A protein has these predicted regions:
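Conserved short alpha-helical segments that host acidic/polar catalytic motifs at enzyme active sites
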Residues: 1-252, 256, 261, 268-307, ...
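Structural beta-sheet core signal
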Residues: 4, 98, 164, 175, ...
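Glycine-rich oxoanion-binding loops at beta->alpha junctions
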Residues: 50, 67, 71-84, 281-299, ...
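Active-site phosphate/pyrophosphate-binding segments
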Residues: 154, 266-270, 274-309, 399-528, ...
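Glycine-rich, anion-gripping cofactor-binding loops and their flanking helix/strand elements
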Residues: 182-188, 192-209, 315, 341-375, ...
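Generic C-terminus detector
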Residues: 259, 555, 568-570, 580-621
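Glycine-rich phosphate-binding loops that contact phosphosugars or nucleotide phosphates
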Residues: 303-445, 449-452, 534-573, 596
Length: 621
């Protein structure tokens, strides 16, 4: 939930570090800091509560010289948000500086042991305990930093990604990871090295990266080949990978916020997601087909699986609920959808014949990563659906499909959700047809319909000005209720989540029929009720639910299929979406809800891209 940036090389470190932190702002944070070994071999540390821009302003008249440094954006886990608790932390000796992402679970025990040895602490963080522990071994072993890091990490219990540097050697930096992501970028001729929580701060400098694995330590020296060892000092082999990441996609592209850009990106993102996978022949629809290498490579395991478990968190979990309905309908397989955080501790029943589908935008979600490791131990096939290429989940899975929607910077997920649903649709269609539970006619028709979704999505986006006007009518609200049935129930959950994430308005999503089992007690003229009331097999039933709300003076905003006249006679306001197959409705019905949440939050003057208390990538439990 924090961002780490490190640099060592030929250039001035400070600009590299600050720009790197700005690239990581999307992850969420409450404070920022930087440490540099200056040209006079002095260790300079600057930290502040608030934005990276505050840190940049603070350091403007300070000594920011040097060719080595580490920097950090922090989300508070141990200790309140403050300059004192911000990273980097410096050892009591003043010789070491460290940044850390993760949680050291036994930090209190270690802190007491260090206090008995005379160490004192300036903060209430677990990170300061870790740097003092490294310093303890550093002073004992003749100031060998790598050995000290190995010894300290053998004592520590928990998750960590760390980068540490020593004042006496400005040509040396050490990084390590355990259950928290860390990437090393390798510059030309090993003259520059970059360290970061993900590749986004690195790619403008080099596209050559090494993804550290759990238990690995990177021993980095300028001008020498990267050396990676484990905690027992044994050498580890590694592969330098080439990252294909378009820098232009990391900008707002003329939009006011990343979130709005990413909402508008969705038609093109879905085209990218389906490119090379969805093969459409409009003249000969019988030739329509889907190409998924994961299905080709693991056909028998997927076809023969009787039980599929989808594990995910947040928005990805909502996508999983849609995936459940798609796979059960098209493949006639039993599908369970579990919160990864609950699944990993529930002693789940997993058989070797099962398939576990892990969904994560970042590919670094700690609970999802732990869940698939558990399932892997029990012999299940692990199928990943992730966005970030080369991420931890992508590397841990047996097979899978990248959603290929490009970097998602806004904390509130939009294009990743529709990308995940698209991939789940491709999987359900391809697997259902492969095993004979989906006939040729339906298969070919659905493929053509799916290929038209990007164009239909553009028609929804054309209504943004009208949705913006509607949003202005709802900023007064303190509570929202989102209701849908069938495929639109997960959309109701996602719409409610988007609103509460960025507007801080309490919102709940329910199956519309469950309204009578409690939520209807809340209905009055002050509570907006959002119905996703598109044409599908439960249309008449949701009309009945709407009439119940109307009779109690509830204010109804309805998402409807274009041309619908019945809902218009009941709802106070409506937003139309184009007609499509029932199974594809979520890809369209979610878009107006994304826009509604966005415009409500903007009208309230809130920070849409970095809402309070939220992190883009949840890399700790």
């Amino acid at each position: 939930m924090c961002g780490i940036v490190g640099y060592i090389g030929q250039s001035d470190a400070f600009p590299v570090l600050i720009e790197g932190l700005k690239r990581l702002e999307y992850r969420g944070y409450d404070s920022a800091g930087v440490a540099l070994i200056g040209n006079q071999d002095n260790l300079n540390v600057y930290k502040t509560k608030g934005k990276v821009s505050n840190l940049e302003a603070m350091a403007a008249d300070k000594d920011c010289s040097g060719h080595i440094g580490i920097a950090h954006t922090r989300w508070a886990t141990h200790g309140e948000p403050s300059a004192a608790n911000a990273h980097p932390h410096v050892s009591m000796s003043g010789e070491l500086a460290l940044v850390h992402n993760g949680i050291i679970e036994n930090y209190q025990v270690l802190k007491e042991q260090l206090a008995d040895k005379g160490y004192t602490f300036k903060s209430s963080t677990d990170t300061e305990v870790l740097v003092q522990l490294i310093d303890h071994y550093y002073q004992q072993n003749g100031k060998d930093l790598v050995s000290a890091v190995c010894q300290a990490l053998n004592d520590a219990i928990g998750a960590y990604a760390i980068t540490v540097m020593e004042k006496k050697d400005p040509g040396h930096i050490v990084a390590a990871r355990q259950s928290s992501p860390l990437v090393v970028g390798v510059g030309k001729d090993n003259k520059d090295f970059y360290i970061a929580s993900d590749a986004t701060p690195i790619v403008e400098h080099t596209n050559k990266v090494v993804y550290l694995e759990d238990g690995e330590i990177a021993d980095i020296r300028v001008g020498e080949e990267l050396n990676i060892i484990n905690l027992e000092h044994a050498s580890c082999s590694y592969t330098i990978k080439t990252v294909d990441l378009d820098i232009s996609k990391l900008s707002k592209g003329g939009f006011d916020h990343y979130m709005l850009k990413e909402i508008y990106d969705q038609p093109n993102c879905l085209k990218d997601c389906m490119s090379g996978r969805l093969i459409v022949d409009k003249e000969h629809p019988e030739n329509n087909h889907i190409v998924l290498s994961a299905l080709r490579d693991y056909r028998d395991r997927l076809v023969n699986a009787k039980h599929i478990i989808i594990v995910a968190c947040g928005t990805s979990w909502h996508a999983g609920l849609i995936g459940k309905q798609l796979i059960e309908k098209m493949c006639r397989k039993r599908v369970e959808v579990a919160y990864a955080s609950e699944f990993r501790y529930a002693d789940p029943v997993i058989e070797p014949e099962d398939v576990v589908i892990a969904i994560s935008q970042s590919g670094e979600t700690a609970d999802t990563l732990a869940a698939i490791k558990l399932a892997k131990e029990k012999g299940a096939l692990i199928f990943g659906i992730v966005n970030a290429v080369g991420s931890s989940i992508a590397r841990e899975t047996d097979t899978g499909v990248y959603i290929h929607v490009g970097p998602e910077i806004g904390v509130a997920s939009t294009k990743a959700f529709t990308g995940q649903v698209t991939v789940l649709t491709l999987l359900a269609l391809a697997l259902g047809h492969e095993q004979g539970t989906l006939d040729d006619a339906d298969y070919h028709e659905m493929i053509e319909e799916l290929s038209e979704i990007p164009q239909k999505m553009e028609k929804v986006l054309e209504q943004a000005p009208m949705i913006k006007s509607l949003a202005l009518m709802f900023t007064y609200a303190h509570n929202f209720l989102y209701l849908g049935r069938g495929m639109n129930f997960p959309v109701a959950l996602e719409g409610a989540l988007k609103l509460k994430e960025i507007s801080y308005i309490h919102a709940e999503g329910y199956p519309a029929a469950e309204m009578k089992h409690g939520p209807i007690a809340l209905v009055d003229q002050d509570m907006p009720i959002v119905f996703i009331a598109t044409h599908h097999q439960l249309y008449e039933k949701i009309i009945s639910n709407m009439q119940e709300v109307k009779s109690r003076n509830g204010r109804i905003l309805a998402i409807v299929t274009e041309g619908d006249e019945l809902v218009k006679n009941i709802a106070d306001n409506e937003i139309e979406i184009p007609k499509t197959q029932n199974a594809l409705i979520p890809l369209l019905s979610v878009v107006p809800l994304q826009l509604l949440a966005y415009y409500v939050a903007v009208d309230k003057g809130l920070d849409v891209d970095m809402p309070r208390n939220l992190a883009k990538s949840v890399t700790v439990e």
